[in-house]
């Protein structure tokens, strides 16, 4: 068994290159090891989104790469030798108005030369600068009014001709990064660069939504997406006997969506694989392998081999699934304690029915204590965080303030107008707008039937715990007599939220969510921008990741120990120092999930 070095993935991978094997290891310096390829040296596609499929014969295991993975993404990025090998590439719609190109390389193991070809995509005849300028005008108007730091924004020079390249590269992102007063909107990446929490998402008008009528009648609809059901991955790097990296990697599953190809194949939190389509995972294919598994974009098939003796490849085929963030719930019995355990990965209001079903399961189990696992929850819809907080606290929160809101100075100066726009009341003593807990009616559902009536809550957290997740912690701490204990690592520290605007330009609908308010609990305490400190420090891995609900999983074990008073052998406040295993924070990959993050409030007209 190989020794492994664990690595966390959250943001874009920079500067990683394939390790050269040297001339002595090559079979032929003049050929590529590929014959019978169906691609041409230069391929041209139209501006619309398309998937291009090619076939070829490979003399050995192979790896494919794109130098523009943000819009030209390889779905089958590696494979074994043989004839009729397939290379599937998704090219996203081009709304930039300009022709763009991507270079594709296919490297066969043992061959010095790689096969190469180019894909050129034409610019949109109906999009381009004109369409993007119209889009930017709408974004600009909304930012001038809603953005929390609109004073500086109104004074700066803005380039309305910037193209919408992607959700991470557009007028909104570029302009807000130039500002200086909006420090609470900025987040520092592991490579030292910055991004902003405010976002602009684009969706084709033809994308379907679920027609099933939910019990909760707020109108936030479910949306299917292609996926294997792998909700999160943690990377691992192999090291040799001297604890030095070998150049090979593996991936460990951190969460699996219910009713998905991955869950049906037996994948769970902690499943660890080191081969992808029969080939090792290396620096050369790590980015594309990760991207394919998290966001395949179509019905692709992959083969994954677990890192254990005698493991056989397991085939997974992506299909349209519902990314249900309610990952796990159960009642744990220990002596007189009946402990409710809930793992929740995103405050996605589209799945409020599923969340309420999980809460009802705990209520019917007559729980005496509760552990809420938000370690992977980056936030989402405020209405869902209010709903869950209400269910946890029960009758104690009736008629109490859930959260106070501070908007920009111009909106705070026009109280009546802002009250009409937001649907929130104004507290003249606190000089802030507010929402109450939803005890009673929640969009047609009586939350009194789901009241758990807890007075103490244990929350499992990490640096990925943010926004609406932190709001649950902070707002419950705002209730007199309610105790919240944090176990794990310091949280993210995001105390600001967004109001969502939706509009259409051309063939796309847009969701714009600029940071527009700061949140406070009933005691007018906001979340520390440096993160919420934990009461008990604990790291979630110690040579492996254990599944949710495993009583020896370090963070859960720490919570159970505090509740029952029985110390578990798994409880530890420090990371394992076992030889050959150490954390690495120098490598990072993009967050490609479509789960809502942040602290999101729908304006009354935007609830649909």
Residue ranges and their predicted role:
Residues 3-6, 11-42, 109-133:
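Bacterial Sec-dependent N-terminal signal peptides
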Residues 33, 57-88:
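Surface-exposed binding patches on compact interaction domains or structured appendages
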Residues 43-48:
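Short, solvent-exposed loop/linker segments at the N-terminal edge
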Residues 52, 85, 98-102, 300-302:
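Exposed beta-strand face motif in extracellular beta-rich ectodomains
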Residues 87-89, 97-110:
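A short beta-strand micro-motif common to beta-rich folds, especially ectodomain repeats
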Residues 93, 108-110, 306-308:
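Surface-exposed loop/turn motifs at beta-strand-loop junctions within extracellular Ig-like
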Residues 126-371, 376-378, 384, 390-394, ...:
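Flexible, low-complexity junctional segments that flank or bridge functional domains
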Residues 339-342, 350-369, 378-608:
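C-terminal "post-core" interaction segments
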């Amino acid at each position: 068994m190989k020794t492994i070095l664990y690595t966390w993935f959250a943001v874009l991978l920079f500067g990683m290159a394939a390790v050269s094997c040297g001339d002595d290891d090559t079979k032929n310096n003049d050929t590529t090891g590929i014959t019978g390829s169906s691609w041409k040296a230069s391929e041209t596609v139209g501006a619309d989104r398309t998937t291009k499929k090619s076939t070829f014969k490979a003399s050995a295991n192979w790896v494919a790469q794109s130098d523009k993975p943000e819009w030209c993404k390889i779905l089958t990025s590696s494979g074994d030798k043989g004839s009729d090998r397939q290379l599937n590439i998704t090219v996203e719609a081009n709304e930039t108005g300009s022709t763009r190109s991507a270079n594709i390389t296919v490297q066969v193991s043992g061959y010095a030369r790689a096969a190469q070809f180019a894909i050129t995509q034409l610019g949109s005849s109906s999009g381009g600068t004109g369409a993007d300028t119209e889009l930017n005008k709408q974004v600009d108007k909304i930012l001038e009014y809603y953005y929390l730091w609109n004073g500086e924004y109104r004074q700066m020079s803005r380039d309305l001709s910037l193209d919408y390249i992607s959700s991470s590269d557009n007028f909104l992102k570029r302009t807000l990064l130039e500002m200086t007063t909006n420090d609470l909107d900025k987040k520092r990446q592991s490579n030292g660069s910055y991004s902003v929490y405010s976002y602009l998402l684009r969706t084709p008008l033809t994308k379907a939504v679920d027609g099933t009528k939910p019990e909760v009648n707020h109108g936030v609809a479910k949306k299917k997406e292609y996926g294997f059901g792998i909700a999160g991955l943690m990377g691992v790097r192999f090291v040799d006997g001297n604890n030095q990296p070998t150049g090979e990697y593996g991936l460990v599953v951190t969460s699996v969506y219910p009713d998905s190809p991955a869950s049906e194949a037996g994948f769970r939190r902690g499943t660890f694989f080191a081969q992808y389509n029969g080939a090792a995972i290396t620096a050369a294919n790590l980015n594309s392998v990760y991207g394919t598994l998290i966001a395949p974009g179509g019905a692709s098939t992959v083969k994954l081999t677990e890192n254990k003796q005698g493991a056989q490849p397991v085939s997974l085929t992506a299909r349209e699934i519902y990314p249900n963030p309610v990952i796990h719930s159960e009642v744990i019995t220990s002596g007189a304690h009946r402990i409710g355990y809930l793992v929740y990965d995103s405050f996605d209001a589209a799945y409020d029915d599923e969340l309420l079903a999980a809460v009802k399961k705990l209520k019917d189990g007559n729980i005496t204590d509760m552990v809420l696992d938000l370690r992977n929850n980056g936030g989402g819809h405020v209405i869902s965080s209010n709903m869950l907080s209400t269910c946890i606290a029960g009758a104690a929160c009736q008629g109490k303030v859930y959260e106070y809101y501070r908007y920009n100075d111009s909106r705070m100066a026009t109280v009546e107008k802002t009250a009409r726009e937001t649907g929130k009341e104004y507290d003249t003593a606190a000089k802030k707008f507010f929402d109450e807990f939803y005890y009673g009616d929640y969009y047609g559902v009586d939350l009194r039937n789901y009241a758990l009536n807890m007075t103490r809550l244990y929350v499992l957290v990490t640096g990925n715990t943010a926004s609406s997740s932190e709001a649950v912690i902070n707002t419950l701490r705002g209730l007199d007599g309610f105790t919240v204990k944090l176990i794990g690592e310091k949280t993210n520290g995001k105390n600001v939220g967004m109001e969502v605007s939706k509009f259409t330009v051309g063939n796309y609908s847009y969701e714009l969510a600029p940071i527009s308010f700061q949140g406070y609990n009933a005691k007018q305490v906001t979340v520390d921008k440096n993160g919420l400190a934990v009461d008990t420090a604990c790291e979630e891995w110690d040579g492996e990741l254990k599944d949710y609900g495993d009583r020896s999983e370090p963070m859960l074990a720490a919570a159970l120990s505090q509740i029952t008073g029985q110390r578990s052998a798994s409880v530890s406040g420090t990371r394992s120092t076992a030889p050959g295993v150490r954390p690495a924070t120098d490598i990072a990959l993009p967050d490609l999930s479509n789960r809502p993050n942040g602290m999101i409030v729908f304006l009354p007209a935007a609830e649909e």
